[in-house]
Amino acid sequence: MREILHIQGGQCGNQIGAKFWEVICDEHGIDHTGKYSGDSDLQLERINVYYNEASGGRYVPRAVLMDLEPGTMDSVRSGPYGQIFRPDNFVFGQSGAGNNWAKGHYTEGAELIDSVLDVVRKEAENCDCLQGFQVCHSLGGGTGSGMGTLLISKIREEYPDRMMLTFSVFPSPKVSDTVVEPYNATLSVHQLVENADECMVLDNEALYDICFRTLKLATPTFGDLNHLISATMSGVTCCLRFPGQLNSDLRKLAVNLIPFPRLHFFMVGFAPLTSRGSQQYRALTVPELTQQMWDAKNMMCAADPRHGRYLTASAMFRGKMSTKEVDEQMLNVQNKNSSYFVEWIPNNVKSSVCDIPPIGLKMASTFIGNSTSIQEMFRRVSEQFTAMFRRKAFLHWYTGEGMDEMEFTEAESNMNDLVAEYQQYQDATAEEEDYEEEEEDEEVAA
């Protein structure tokens, strides 16, 4: 019941995805052959959200892995949980997208997309009542961004009423892999605004900062970064996989978090984040979790929530705790920081409680916020985009694959509209008089 189909694309998506499955397998007591070796019935109760039970009692992830080159997938296959995936669900090309969105979306990716869709269809038919899809990808490269968004739009056509959740790694301001990241990201956001229901926004720089500042890691690796992401991903979906007092699913999440359809880009955070050495010295209490969870340093994307206002937010607590205390703490945060919440959506913070904590912790919490400050990130990418596009730098790589300059202009203006929309709601107040005055002004202007 209520299955989620997981799709990972490109190098980044496959690496995050592989880590995510390690965490999920751990939580459900599944070893790397797919056999159950856990000790609690709760692990099996709703295991079919992410796993399909095959013959001989093996649990197979409902995962589709795609890439335009075989490299990353080979390393997933030879990784610790590589043998658990269905071999047919690895779909890869040979040519690579070369960090080019157009290759992923129009040429190389378009050739491979039908075989990916076949696998998606097969997995969807295996579901009792498919709830939705979750896609892991990055927006800076070619495959995850170009082919990822192509797949999302195709799935949208075929399954229009299912939820589409993405975990999208945005290019970060200082840590850049390729010079054309702003192009790829802007073209992708253009697609995500229209075709995705909820986007969890991640970025490497914020993750580096967390590893460096909070976790005190001297040289954080991508493995450490992906571990943070997978903890969050596991937290977002724990309500679906374990029983709890206040449950939520992808659709409830969307209903509570999205006041306007285009504004579905969320900041995520996770608590407790403690460095490995100091873990045992900290007593975890609900107030502590709540405090750390709302801390700007905990956000996994490079935007500061104190520069904007929260439209809505949702918190998922895990572990044995009192629901009453959770509610009190959440109210407490809202009352103390009321200026950071828009006053025209009362009770805009939702919490859910799930009884089973992550491995190795007594309690934990995952935070998802819809904050207007995320426009900082779009603004930054947009500025970099405009700087290059004004000079038509690197454009021939894209036009050579059959793209039109018009498409760039459209993507650019869509991104700018999105920023303007966030700004509009950040400035909006609850007083009626303002609206009447505004309307009069508009009439005069007209």
From Swiss-Prot:
Keywords, alphabetical: Cytoplasm, Cytoskeleton, GTP-binding, Magnesium, Metal-binding, Microtubule, Nucleotide-binding
Entries under InterPro entries matching the protein: Beta-tubulin_BS (IPR013838), Beta_tubulin (IPR002453), Tub_FtsZ_C (IPR008280), Tubulin (IPR000217), Tubulin/FtsZ-like_C (IPR037103), Tubulin/FtsZ_2-layer-sand-dom (IPR018316), Tubulin/FtsZ_GTPase_sf (IPR036525), Tubulin_C (IPR023123)
Cofactor: Mg(2+)
Example of a GO MF term: structural constituent of cytoskeleton
BP GO terms, sorted: microtubule cytoskeleton organization; mitotic cell cycle
Induction of synthesis: Down-regulated by abscisic acid (ABA).
Bias type Acidic residues, positions: 429-446
Entry-linked SUPFAM superfamilies: Tubulin C-terminal domain-like (SSF55307), Tubulin nucleotide-binding domain-like (SSF52490)
Primary site of residence: cytoplasm
Listed SMART domains: Tubulin, Tubulin_C
Region (Disordered): 421-446
Residues annotated as binding GTP: Q11, E69, S138, G142, T143, G144, N204, N226
CDD domains tied to this protein: beta_tubulin
Location within or outside the cell: Cytoplasm, Cytoskeleton
Lineage: superkingdom: Eukaryota
Tissue expression per record: Expressed in roots, second node, leaf sheaths, and suspension cultured cells.
Binding site for Mg(2+): E69
GO cellular component: cytoplasm; microtubule
Self-association state and partner proteins as the record states: Dimer of alpha and beta chains. A typical microtubule is a hollow water-filled tube with an outer diameter of 25 nm and an inner diameter of 15 nM. Alpha-beta heterodimers associate head-to-tail to form protofilaments running lengthwise along the microtubule wall with the beta-tubulin subunit facing the microtubule plus end conferring a structural polarity. Microtubules usually have 13 protofilaments but different protofilament numbers can be found in some organisms and specialized cells.
Cited function: Tubulin is the major constituent of microtubules, a cylinder consisting of laterally associated linear protofilaments composed of alpha- and beta-tubulin heterodimers. Microtubules grow by the addition of GTP-tubulin dimers to the microtubule end, where a stabilizing cap forms. Below the cap, tubulin dimers are in GDP-bound state, owing to GTPase activity of alpha-tubulin.
Family recorded in the similarity comment: Belongs to the tubulin family.
Protein name: Tubulin beta-3 chain
